[in-house]
Curated annotation (Swiss-Prot):
Belongs to the class-I aminoacyl-tRNA synthetase family. It comes from Mesomycoplasma hyopneumoniae (strain 7448) (Mycoplasma hyopneumoniae). GO terms for biological process: arginyl-tRNA aminoacylation. A motif ('HIGH' region) lies at residues 120-130. It is found in: Cytoplasm. This is Arginine--tRNA ligase. One of its GO terms (cellular component) is cytoplasm. The gene is argS. HAMAP family: Arg_tRNA_synth.
Length: 534
């Protein structure tokens, strides 16, 4: 309905050759002044040299002549327009939801999107920081696909460079400590996961490398490849335990092995040589300064492989219309340089980067602080022992990606209406139980009169708007907020309405069915089970 009203107003302005900025047209949900209201007449009266009340009246007359299923339109000084939806429209909304079922809220946007997320270094178990990126990425992919887009989910394995050297020396040292005293390197990773990995080595190779050294190339190669493999297998297992899937795991080292880094940089414009190093003039395209691609010793920088990786994604067989990268907020310094690199070859429209903030974990009222360097990390494995997958996905996604998440383990595990996820699932279970013991007669005409019914139906219709909004701003938390509001409205309706035995029973059961459908659709997008009973 909101879309219909907007389109009708825009059509009116264009037909009358009046000035309107469509981006500033606002149709707001209203409780006290009709179902929807707009200040469009106030906004554009001056530009069109028309009195705002007169413009509002003209808009009213035009819209009433169109088939918008509006009961009435009222004008309030100095030019507000209030729209009242016809009672028939509420019945139409409920019928539409039931008829479309699991397809209610879908669109057909038809864009190809490469979505890269998680991309954690294979140097240990996934922790809470990685978890947030994983959940955001997976839910966003679900919503983008639900909207009719084609989404290619990609994990970039950073298996090249100094962090891998640190991993190898750390695991090798812990392996040596199984047999004898052996000093840890100064920059060693200190986590329990490194000790675990070394024990895995011992299970596979026994004492084969007891007297070996990393100076031996074959020993180094085995420790490098096996350490990455062991941790990558664990990363994949953790993601699977959260029902998070990928279409491909791409390797940074593979880019170098196949010389794709060199090939992609060979014809890059705005490259110059200075101080025996090779630079890219990113400052010309919005970066703070130019960036080194190849050091004076001939070594490629991380930036060079990142550029090559993005070019590979863009030129892949998938041929994406645009890319989305989901990175931790600590990568903020990389955003401008990466976008600048793509601008050098006119690909700046191809990349959106979401920077998500940290997760703070609270346990028994105390914050559990993480430090991988000191070996104190709270991993996904740890969290899954305390709360289930559904709770993790809900509480990690309930805040905007650019806001801090405070994850309360106690609340997430609580079977109580204080727990927002429990409340939503409780509403779905309530609806399911009622419908399981009742019969809806599809042929009967639906009728909705009570305010709590029409408010609930209006909220149901908003599901479409929420889905579309998320495809534009990527704020998946809007879905959590919406589902909680819908569940609260339904629980109130359920508690304050006599449904079975009501002379309008069939309509109220149909409304309950519509609520069940929308809750289930929304929870499915979050990757959460819609429980039939609690």
């Amino acid at each position: 309905m909101k879309k219909k009203i907007s389109q009708a107003i825009i059509k009116f302005f264009k037909n009358e050759n009046l000035i309107i900025d469509e981006s500033k047209l606002i149709i707001e949900k209203s409780k006290n002044f009709g179902d929807y209201s707009s200040n469009v007449a106030l906004m554009f009266a001056k530009q069109n040299k028309i009195d705002s009340l007169k413009l509002a009246q003209t808009i009213k007359n035009q819209l009433l002549s169109e088939n918008l299923n509006l009961e009435k339109i009222e004008i309030a000084p100095p030019g507000f327009i209030n729209f009242f939806i016809s009672k028939n429209e509420y019945a139409n909304i409920v019928s539409e939801i039931i008829q479309k079922g699991e397809n209610f809220g879908r669109y057909s946007l038809q864009k190809k999107i490469n979505l890269e997320f998680v991309s954690a270094n294979p140097t240990g178990f996934l922790h809470l920081g990685h978890l947030r990126g994983a959940v955001i990425g997976d839910i966003l992919a679900n919503i983008l696909e639900f909207s009719g887009n084609f989404v290619f989910r990609e994990y970039y394995i950073n298996d090249f460079g100094s962090q891998i050297d640190r991993l190898v020396s750390s695991v090798f040292s812990r392996y040596q400590q199984i047999f004898k005293k052996f000093a840890l390197p100064e920059e060693a990773y200190l986590g329990e996961d490194i000790i675990w990995c070394a024990q895995k080595f011992f299970q596979i190779y026994a004492n084969k490398f007891e007297n070996s050294s990393l100076d031996d190339l074959e020993t180094y190669k085995i420790f490098r490849e096996k350490s990455i493999e062991i941790f990558l297998d664990e990363i994949k297992a953790d993601l699977a335990n959260l029902s998070i899937k990928f279409d491909v795991f791409s390797s940074e080292s593979e880019l170098f092995r196949t010389e794709k880094v060199q090939k992609n940089l060979a014809n890059l414009p705005f490259v110059y040589k200075k101080e025996e190093a090779i630079w890219l003039k990113t400052s010309k395209f919005g970066d703070q300064k130019d960036r080194v691609l190849v050091k004076k010793n001939g070594e490629f920088t991380y930036f060079s492989s990142d550029i090559a990786y993005h070019f590979e994604k863009i030129n892949s067989n998938f041929k994406p219309d645009f890319l989305i990268n989901i990175w931790g907020a600590d990568h903020i310094g990389y955003v401008d340089r990466m976008k600048a690199a793509l601008k050098t070859v006119n690909l700046n429209q191809k990349l959106d980067i979401l920077l998500y903030q940290l997760v703070k974990l609270f346990k028994n009222g105390q914050e559990f602080k993480m430090s991988k360097r000191m070996g104190k990390t709270f991993t996904i494995k740890d969290l899954l022992e305390l709360v289930d997958q559904d709770a993790i996905r809900y509480f990690i996604s309930e805040r905007s990606y650019n806001s801090l998440v405070e994850f309360d383990i106690g609340l997430a595990a609580k079977i109580s209406l204080q727990n927002p996820l429990f409340l939503i699932q409780y509403a779905h279970a309530r609806a399911s139980k009622l419908l399981a013991n009742s019969t809806i007669v599809p042929e009967k005409i639906l009728k909705f009169e009570a305010e709590n019914e029409t408010i609930l139906i209006s909220k149901l219709k908003q599901f479409e708007e929420i889905v579309l909004k998320i495809t534009k701003n990527y704020k998946i938390n809007l879905l959590n907020k919406y589902l909680l509001e819908l569940a609260n409205l339904f629980n109130s309706f359920y508690s304050n309405s006599k449904i079975i035995g009501n002379q309008n029973q069939n309509s109220l059961l149909s409304l309950t069915k519509a609520v069940q459908i929308v809750l289930k659709n929304g929870l499915k997008l979050l990757g959460i089970k819609a429980k039939e009973r609690i």
